[in-house]
Amino acid sequence: MNKSGIYLHIPFCKTKCIYCDFYSVTKREDSIDKFVDCIVKEIKLNKGRLNNTTYDTIFFGGGTPSVLSENQLDKILNALFNHCDIDQNIEITLECNPGEISFEKLSNFRKIGIN
Protein backbone atom coordinates (compact mmCIF):
# COMPACT_ATOMS: atom_id res chain seq x y z
CA MET A 1 0.00 0.00 0.00
CA ASN A 2 1.26 3.48 -0.89
CA LYS A 3 1.67 6.16 1.77
CA SER A 4 0.89 9.78 1.11
CA GLY A 5 -0.26 13.01 2.72
CA ILE A 6 -3.35 15.14 2.26
CA TYR A 7 -3.14 18.91 1.78
CA LEU A 8 -6.34 20.92 2.15
CA HIS A 9 -6.14 24.56 1.09
CA ILE A 10 -8.50 26.65 3.20
CA PRO A 11 -8.59 30.01 1.39
CA PHE A 12 -10.24 32.09 4.12
CA CYS A 13 -8.58 34.84 6.17
CA LYS A 14 -9.83 37.45 8.60
CA THR A 15 -8.09 40.05 6.42
CA LYS A 16 -5.83 39.80 3.38
CA CYS A 17 -2.20 40.44 4.32
CA ILE A 18 -0.31 42.66 1.87
CA TYR A 19 2.71 40.32 1.82
CA CYS A 20 0.75 37.13 1.07
CA ASP A 21 0.90 35.64 -2.43
CA PHE A 22 -1.35 32.67 -1.65
CA TYR A 23 -4.93 32.53 -2.87
CA SER A 24 -7.21 33.75 -0.10
CA VAL A 25 -10.46 35.59 0.46
CA THR A 26 -11.77 37.40 3.50
CA LYS A 27 -13.82 35.37 5.93
CA ARG A 28 -17.57 35.08 5.30
CA GLU A 29 -19.32 32.54 7.48
CA ASP A 30 -21.88 31.52 4.82
CA SER A 31 -19.06 30.89 2.33
CA ILE A 32 -17.08 28.85 4.84
CA ASP A 33 -20.02 26.54 5.61
CA LYS A 34 -20.62 25.95 1.88
CA PHE A 35 -16.89 25.38 1.32
CA VAL A 36 -16.73 22.78 4.12
CA ASP A 37 -19.79 21.00 2.71
CA CYS A 38 -18.11 20.89 -0.72
CA ILE A 39 -14.89 19.44 0.73
CA VAL A 40 -16.89 16.71 2.49
CA LYS A 41 -18.82 15.97 -0.70
CA GLU A 42 -15.58 15.79 -2.71
CA ILE A 43 -14.06 13.36 -0.20
CA LYS A 44 -17.12 11.10 -0.46
CA LEU A 45 -17.17 11.28 -4.28
CA ASN A 46 -13.50 10.29 -4.50
CA LYS A 47 -13.61 7.46 -1.97
CA GLY A 48 -12.88 4.79 -4.58
CA ARG A 49 -9.93 6.72 -5.97
CA LEU A 50 -8.39 7.04 -2.51
CA ASN A 51 -8.49 3.34 -1.53
CA ASN A 52 -4.98 2.24 -2.53
CA THR A 53 -3.21 4.74 -0.30
CA THR A 54 -2.68 5.07 3.44
CA TYR A 55 -2.49 8.68 4.56
CA ASP A 56 -0.04 9.54 7.32
CA THR A 57 -0.34 13.34 7.28
CA ILE A 58 -3.16 15.84 6.90
CA PHE A 59 -2.14 19.47 6.46
CA PHE A 60 -4.61 22.35 6.55
CA GLY A 61 -2.94 25.29 4.80
CA GLY A 62 -4.22 28.54 3.46
CA GLY A 63 -5.26 31.27 3.83
CA THR A 64 -5.73 30.95 7.55
CA PRO A 65 -7.41 27.60 8.28
CA SER A 66 -7.76 28.50 11.95
CA VAL A 67 -10.65 30.82 11.02
CA LEU A 68 -12.71 27.64 10.66
CA SER A 69 -14.61 26.58 13.75
CA GLU A 70 -13.77 23.38 15.57
CA ASN A 71 -17.06 21.92 14.28
CA GLN A 72 -16.20 22.76 10.67
CA LEU A 73 -12.75 21.19 10.98
CA ASP A 74 -14.19 18.17 12.78
CA LYS A 75 -16.68 17.68 9.93
CA ILE A 76 -13.80 17.55 7.42
CA LEU A 77 -11.71 15.24 9.60
CA ASN A 78 -14.65 12.87 10.14
CA ALA A 79 -15.17 12.63 6.38
CA LEU A 80 -11.49 11.84 5.86
CA PHE A 81 -11.44 9.22 8.62
CA ASN A 82 -14.67 7.63 7.33
CA HIS A 83 -13.70 7.52 3.64
CA CYS A 84 -9.89 7.21 3.55
CA ASP A 85 -7.36 4.77 4.96
CA ILE A 86 -5.80 6.89 7.72
CA ASP A 87 -2.64 5.74 9.51
CA GLN A 88 -3.20 5.28 13.25
CA ASN A 89 -0.19 7.57 13.94
CA ILE A 90 -1.43 10.37 11.67
CA GLU A 91 0.07 13.84 11.95
CA ILE A 92 -2.60 16.53 11.56
CA THR A 93 -1.29 20.08 11.14
CA LEU A 94 -3.18 23.36 10.92
CA GLU A 95 -1.71 26.76 10.04
CA CYS A 96 -2.72 29.54 12.43
CA ASN A 97 -2.19 33.28 12.59
CA PRO A 98 -0.46 33.77 15.97
CA GLY A 99 -2.13 37.15 16.43
CA GLU A 100 -5.60 35.63 16.13
CA ILE A 101 -5.35 32.34 18.03
CA SER A 102 -6.19 31.64 21.67
CA PHE A 103 -5.17 28.87 24.05
CA GLU A 104 -8.83 27.83 24.23
CA LYS A 105 -9.09 27.43 20.46
CA LEU A 106 -5.80 25.50 20.35
CA SER A 107 -7.10 23.21 23.11
CA ASN A 108 -10.31 22.63 21.15
CA PHE A 109 -8.31 21.83 18.01
CA ARG A 110 -6.36 19.26 20.02
CA LYS A 111 -9.61 17.67 21.22
CA ILE A 112 -10.69 17.01 17.62
CA GLY A 113 -7.35 15.38 16.76
CA ILE A 114 -5.16 18.19 15.45
CA ASN A 115 -1.77 17.42 16.91
Model-derived features with residue positions:
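Acidic (Asp/Glu)-rich catalytic clusters
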Residues: N108-I114
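A short alpha->loop->secondary-structure connector
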Residues: I86
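Canonical Radical SAM [4Fe-4S] cluster-binding loop centered on the CxxxCxxC motif
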Residues: N2-K34, I112
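Short acidic/polar active-site loop segments enriched in Thr and Asp
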Residues: S4, T53-D56, I90, N115
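A short, N-terminal amphipathic alpha-helix
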Residues: I39-N51
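Hydrophobic alpha-helical membrane-association signature
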Residues: F35-I39, I76
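Conserved glycine-rich "GG(E/T)P / GGGxP" loop and the immediately following alpha-helix
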Residues: T26, G48-H83, I92-N108
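Generic detector of well-ordered alpha-helical packing
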Residues: I10, F22, I43, C96-P98
